[in-house]
Amino acid sequence: MIEDELIFVSNNYVKLKEVQKKLGELDVKVTSKNYNFHEQIENDLFCITADKTIIAYDNILKPLIVMDTGFYVENYPNNPGFPGAFIKTNLLDTIGIKGLLENMKNVADRKCLLKECLAYYDGDNFKVFESSQEGTLAYSEYQGTNSDKYTKLFGVFIPEGYSKTVSEMSSDEKDELAKTNPNVLSLFANWYKKERSKCLVKK
């Protein structure tokens, strides 16, 4: 059943604020709850996010959402598509952004893909949203002070059609990017609004 309260399963404070801001426009109250998931094996962002959502609901038993991000560097040396769906374990907790850039320093074709996946489950309704943005990997990391940078990848990801990383973009530029390529949070918010309207009509 569509409710006016949701749990965001994450310990990412900045990402929580983004979710609260977006869903707050619909008067939906969002609180966060951390959950320690077992390590995933399959490198499939859709499956990982969906599995996490079902597992979390079985333990929390309240309407919730789970968000995950995948990053795929097309011509990463000896491992095309690295780091894939395992950004934290394969990249951030190992070689880090500096290691990624070091290993890519002699690669001219720096195409990459940033994917996001959001899953919602309330015990009855189960829905998964996906979005992707093509772009290129920068040669150096932008060390900005953007308070809304919830992933370090924004400091090295240059969206297609732009000449700067996401972290370097102004708020207006980010809004423009979101309009041309809606992220999963926007897709979910639009769906949630429609579903809630249907429930109100039935009442």
Predicted regions located by residue number:
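Anionic-ligand binding patches
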Residues: 2-7, 14-203
